[in-house]
Amino acid sequence: MTYTPPEPKLDIAELRLSTQKAVAIAWPSAPTALGTEENGVIAQKDVAQSPQPSASTAKLITVLTVLQKHPLGLTEQGPLVTMNDDDVERYNRYYSEGGSTITVHRGQQISQRQLIEGTLLPSANNYADSLAVWSFGSLEKYRQAAQKYVRSLGANRTTIGSDASGFDPSTTSTAHDLVLIGIAAATQPLVRTVMAKKSTELPIIGKKDSTNWLLGTNGFIGGKTGNTDQAGGVFVGVAEKQITSQKKITIVTAVQGDKSVNQA
């Protein structure tokens, strides 16, 4: 399916962070939050945010949870994962439901790194589920591990649902929690590196572009897009901001549940 990610109305280029001055932010209409690596969540619209479907931003949780169990260095490909009938069925199901997919075949071997890149960049739902099942043995065991992981981040209003992709609306979160998850992604070296890529090369299909078309604009170096009928437009953005000649900070924003992807 063709996907246009949300463009946040928070202008990273104009943001001024200071310990002496409050930050004036023109908030979007949707639930929104802002944070930094150093300080966590520093501002949010509507403190009493209600959990809403996270859509594909849940894939950040998937990859971070898997890397807790199966860490990879920046240049490592990791183990080869052999696709089986269940993996093919996942592809067929997501494809039939209009979800983002990448074709797989029984007996095909895909490295852990390729599964991660296919999950984060073109946002393949079947790759996310296959990665989680390979790592934990089942989606239920993945769900338990991921739930424990997000709690360790302080994302206490995030619930991991029935899949690892976020396609099912049972995975829910808040903009506040998505900023915490985005900070975790920005501080994980491999995830930060992968998020910054505009495209990846994958088995059989070749080059696939990132859904995050904001990369390289206004300081954006990463993040994750999300969009479903139930979730609306969801976006976690990671940007770098030079605040002094010697200091650069990483800013994470989250916009959740806007009426459409383009309005988020």
What are the roles of these predicted feature ranges?
Residues 1-9, 18, 244-245, 259-264:
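Domain-scale selection of a single, long terminal region
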Residues 3-176, 183-186:
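Active-site-adjacent loops and short helices of periplasmic peptidoglycan-processing enzymes
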Residues 169-172, 177, 182-264:
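Domain-terminus/edge residues, biased toward the C-terminal soluble/receptor-binding domains
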